Amino acid sequence: MRRSRRVALALGAAAALAAGTTAAAASTSAGSDNHRGATVFVSPWGDDHDSGANPGHSVRTLQRAQQVVRSLDSAMSGDIRVELADGTYSMAQPLALDSRDSGTNGHTVIWTAAPGAHPVISGGTRVSGFHPSGQTTSSGAQIWSAPAPAGLPSREMFIDGHRASRASGAVPVTLTATATGYTASSDLMAAWGNPTDIEFVYSGGDGYWSLSTGGLGAWTEPRCPIASVSGTTITMAEPCWVNSTQRVMRTDGSGRTVNLVGPASVGNHELPTSVENARELLQQPGQFYYDAKAGRVDYVPLPGEKPAHADVELATAQTLVSGSGTAEAPVHDIAFSGLQFSYGTWNQPSSNEGFSEIQAGYTITGANGYATQGLCQFIPGGTCPFGDWTKEPGNISFNHDQRISFTGDVFTHLGAAGLDLGDGSQNDTVQGSVFTDISGNGVDLGGVDDPMPAVAGDHTVGNQITDNHIFSTSVEYRSGVGIDVGYAENTLISHNQIDHTPYTAISIGWGGWPDKIKAPAIANSSHGNVISDNLIYDAMQYLADGGAIYTQGITGSSLADGEQISGNVIHDILDHGHAIYCDNGSTFMTITSNVEYNNQNDWGSPHGDYVPPADGSTDDPLDVEHNYWQQGDKDSNQKNVVVAANTIIGGPQDAPRTLVDAAGLEPRYRSLLSVDPGRGRGAVPAAPEQAAASAGEGSAYVSFTPTFFDQGRPVTAYTVTASPGGKQVRVDAPTYLKSFYVLVPGLTDGTAYTFTVTADTARASESSAPSLPTRAVTPGPTTALPAAPASASADVGVGDVSVHWNPATVAHGTSPSLSYDVTLTDQKTGAVTTVTETGKTEVWATNGRDTFAVVSGLTHGDAYAITVAARNAAGVGPAASAGVVTIG
């Protein structure tokens, strides 16, 4: 495995800063007087029969180094360093640590890179011997093949440091859902090989225009394997299918499931968005298919790629490093510094359990999971506690541990969550590290299986996640989050930069959903958690109903010890939700001095308080003050919710410079921004997603979600291609992000068209594969104008006004709204200013969604009459009045 020196230098600096004096511990040999500490030397070219006493006598494996450490650490009077030389350490078995591997007498066992080294702890199996198979794709591209170990489970493959894509595509037949799966319109899929390898994917997110979405809620993307295909009958794997389509409904007329989180079944009439992992789908460069039964990998190379000479890794180990203690005997005082963890996988989604999702990587599992798991007091036979669903594992995981630290490390090319610090994790530190190209969550902290631990050692308390760069995570299980926290106490999440995530950036809390049925949120031990000074942008790039910071459940016993969210800078959160999202049961939260702009919504929202003695007549206590935002909520103090002294801004230039500059990585950690392990040779960006189309006269409008996973190849433009005819329109990326649609002219009225989109880079050879095609739309005359927006209003700031409206109703079969004209007429001078508001919200939002825009640079003391009008392909519709306001 190759790793650039630039990456290693940046990480080495971060590791040294984060580790502080710990990294400078004494480094005498393993056999030296333990009063001065000791060093155990490890090298991929070492010998496990050797002593590890010096570099010339290095041991080979981490497990042998572990044995040497155990022989030294019973009476430590100095730190023990396990120094890893340059190279790759293949983990056929995980490094499994327990209390015997702990530091003692106040000292630490430090697993660290040797000076200048770039060690990689790998769960991969290298694949070599690629050769042309003699077969080609439908476009004539050569398929290459190589032998691989038969029966070895894997879902991910990496080539020269970049992630290959599993073979996937549109479902090639029309499906009708049945109790056990589907009836297909033809027997085409019955001829496909290895049907049990195939998965259907059900994408959530926001549906609009021609796009219909499903999932188990807009925040999810479940997937289920196929069990068999016979003729036109497709039988889905159990229990995934029943857990995803038969979730039990309440009988109280609430229309809710017993789990209170999402719907009873996958949406969009239970139709999958795409199909994945069949050799017959192998079409696009960069795609692979691993036939575990035959022991073969098939791959379509990217332009210029030479598989025979590439470093190809199948991710095969589920756990690389684990630390497991008990409440009475925790594993403790162990540090990891300057290491890279790569090539882990996770096998549950490939099993009959599939990925039957609830939220944030938690799934329902087991034969009766849909009817019992985590349903506790709400259904007979429900297991306790409420909300205890199956947690996504971490490829690096600890539980019942104390003072574990990860500093200056890289978590990348992983197939589950990156790092899981589970129940009983106490006073751990994650600092100065990089998390990217991870299939699931970046960092997991705590769990949801023990809301009120009875034993001190079971509490998750005092952990710090600071100064990390977390980006392009959740690239396979795209409902994942950058940092996910369950029930935890006195947590500090500060000075991280989190960007380019498909769903929520930070999620904290659990168990608030019972307020949907006027029942109290689940009592839990959480308190004293702080989320401060983080820089979060370009989150929510794919799914919806989340936020930059998503919270739920009880967070303390008062505002004094409840959750504190302060000093965060949050911008360009794409899909619908809230930049700071107080979801069900969010109680005792203080939200102050945050800077928020270019978001669909900045903050929301209060919920009824049903924790006794409250009866829902008041809300969960919240304090929202001194924020700088564009939403512009008026000051209020009612029902236990205070909203006060917040400032409307036009952008970051209107917020205090000290707040804006302080957010994100502190200066000494900003070298992490140059670390991108995804910049492998030949990498290309992931394809755009969720393409939707709307017809105009002789034209069509095409919208799509932008690429959030560019594999180190920044997207500079997007190309839309029409079929039939091949008409193409290319638009640069910044222009697209402003309007969120591409106009494709020169089409023939009365002809049905579909459209695909590619993400382009500065190099013509590095464009992505095309997106899935849109549904067909038929151009034709468009004459109907949109109606006037509803509920227009304005909130006044200092030189700014936040104008709100509900989107216009659009007649069926006519063009949807594409933008909005906000017009201000100065009542003193008669000057008229019109600002055209464009973007994802304006394109997507329906008439039930509050939409807003800020207009800046207005004259103090002047009165302005404000109107809002929708614009579609036919022109500008009638305006709605937002009233006359005087600028402060």
Describe each region flagged by the PLM.
Residues 680-714, 749, 765-816, 860, ...:
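Pro/Thr/Ser/Gly-rich low-complexity, intrinsically disordered linker/stalk tracts
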Residues 41-400, 405, 451-455, 678-681:
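Extracellular polysaccharide-degrading/modifying enzymes targeting complex plant/algal/animal polysaccharides
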Residues 744-765, 855-874:
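Beta-strand-rich modules
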Residues 332-343, 382-384, 402-416, 425-440, ...:
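Right-handed parallel beta-helix
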Residues 165, 171, 343, 347, ...:
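Extracellular beta-rich repeat passengers
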